[in-house]
Amino acid sequence: MDIRAIVISLLISTCVQADRICVGYLSTNSTEKVDTLLESDVPVTSSIDLVETNHTGTYCSLDGISPVHLGDCSFEGWIVGNPACTSNFGIREWSYLIEDPSAPHGLCYPGELDNNGELRHLFSGIRSFSRTELIAPSSWGEVNDGATSACRDNTGTSSFYRNLIWFVKKDNRYPVISRTYNNTTGRDVLVMWGIHHPISTDETKLLYVNSDPYTLVTTSSWSKKYKLETGVRPGYNGQRSWMKIYWVLMHPGESITFESNGGLLAPRYGYIIEEYGKGRIFQSPIRIARCNTRCQTSVGGINTNKTFQNIERNALGNCPKYIKSGQLKLATGLRNVPATSNRGLFGAIAGFIEGGWPGLINGWYGFQHQNEQGVGIAADKESTQKAIDQITTKINNIIDKMNGNYDSIRGEFSQVEQRINMLADRIDDAVTDVWSYNAKLLVLLENDKTLDMHDANVRNLHEQVRKTLKANAIDEGNGCFELLHKCNDSCMETIRNGTYNHSEYAEESKLKRQEIEGIKLESEDNVYKALSIYSCIASSIVLVGLILAFIMWTCNSGNCRFNVCI
């Protein structure tokens, strides 16, 4: 700042103790920071983290419905009826299933469950079923029920899968047997059957008499004939032959017919699907606790109102969308600019250009004033409430945008058959990557908009005051206005609430402006005179110095001689 400006400011501040009003915004001691598209770690007065990272660490009831733990049985052992799993046969309803990945009781006889992954996926969407007898064992005719030491019940007695019947010869005969099941339940029914593949032709004859038996399974839409494939396979539980178990979901009114002369594992019990829903089969060793949750994962329950979570992708229930980011902070306040230590001349109040105000209560934007009654500060609640409403809408819009788009993708897969739905699980990683990026980009954009909105709100408030005061004040350019008339606290309130009467103070303001302009002109004239005198004196001193320096130089070099005569 040049000497003239300093002198003018000193004269004005000394001669005129003007009333002033400033527009500003809140600043706090908050350490919150957010990222925008162009900046990182921007200080803000407040923010919220949209990503949930906490969970219960336990299995909980989901919306009041308890889960079911399969105990020592795997899903396969439970669904086909391993005799060691009889304690689970009464299960009817669950919110989700829990399977111990190392459960000892699976398929007790060597073999496999066909399309096991698809059946698991089907049961991920079932909430309740009932177990029902499909075909009575006694109706099949001249065959015996088979049992094996590989499948022992809880008493140690040889047995077999409780939902199937293994037919073997009776009185050295195995005639062609045939039965049909008609689904008259009005609901979908899960029907299972199987084929036993002996280790040799001799074993085939021993069990079924016929050397080349067959099994024919027929529905209204397909038919398949099974031949026994003899051979030694890797075994366990003392058995080397093989059993393959099949299943079909029959819709109301459909029927299925079984015809065989050896090797058939016939259906006995099936499952009536009473309610479909959104379920899951979780596999983890965490315990079941007495708790309730809105969202369950294999590592724990999630109870939150946040938009996203990064705990686990395969979550069940009313869950935030999974993203890979561990933190996404959304600005809910304004840019946090600390107040300057020195406020104007002599500690005077200052506007938003010089930083925020730590003393602003119940608002983000407001006014400070200075008059004969002292210094006051007040929030502008109307502009603050509008900003809060905008941010609330912004948060809701983020939730709607993410939910709507994500669910529309999942909806496309739910309209096609189950195998393609299984593919949806496999591409979820790619979908998660896309939505993690989208979520981060959306939050960065919204943070930019929020901070720009706050800046605009402060400028709009400043412009509103400028238009209200008109020529009755001088805009100092820092967010403050120097009033050209006396303005007590009541007058300041009219400026804040927009009821200020400009004409009431116009004459006083006009006189004050003329007085200030006169002081400025006189001050400028005095400054110019002072500068002229200082310039003349300085020039003379420099000239005398040059002359003395020249004389001394000539004397030293012998070119100058002084003669003194008496």
Swiss-Prot record:
GO terms for cellular component: host cell plasma membrane; membrane; viral envelope; virion membrane. The record marks 343-344 as: Cleavage. It comes from the Viruses. Residues 554-566 are cytoplasmic. Keywords: Clathrin- and caveolin-independent endocytosis of virus by host, Clathrin-mediated endocytosis of virus by host, Disulfide bond, Fusion of virus membrane with host endosomal membrane, Fusion of virus membrane with host membrane, Glycoprotein, Hemagglutinin, Host cell membrane, Host membrane, Host-virus interaction, Lipoprotein, Membrane, Palmitate, Signal, Transmembrane, Transmembrane helix, Viral attachment to host cell, Viral envelope protein, Viral penetration into host cytoplasm, Virion, Virus endocytosis by host, Virus entry into host cell. It is found in: Virion membrane; Host apical cell membrane. Glycans are attached at residues 29, 54, 182-183, 305, 488, 497, 501. Residues 1-18 form the signal peptide. Disulfide bonds join 22-480, 60-291, 73-85, 108-151, 295-319, 487-491. InterPro entries: Capsid_hemagglutn, Hemagglutn_HA1_a/b_dom_sf, Hemagglutn_influenz_A, Hemagglutn_influenz_A/B. GO terms for biological process: clathrin-dependent endocytosis of virus by host cell; fusion of virus membrane with host endosome membrane; fusion of virus membrane with host plasma membrane; viral budding from plasma membrane; virion attachment to host cell. Palmitoylated. One of its GO terms (molecular function) is host cell surface receptor binding. Belongs to the influenza viruses hemagglutinin family. Homotrimer of disulfide-linked HA1-HA2. This is Hemagglutinin.
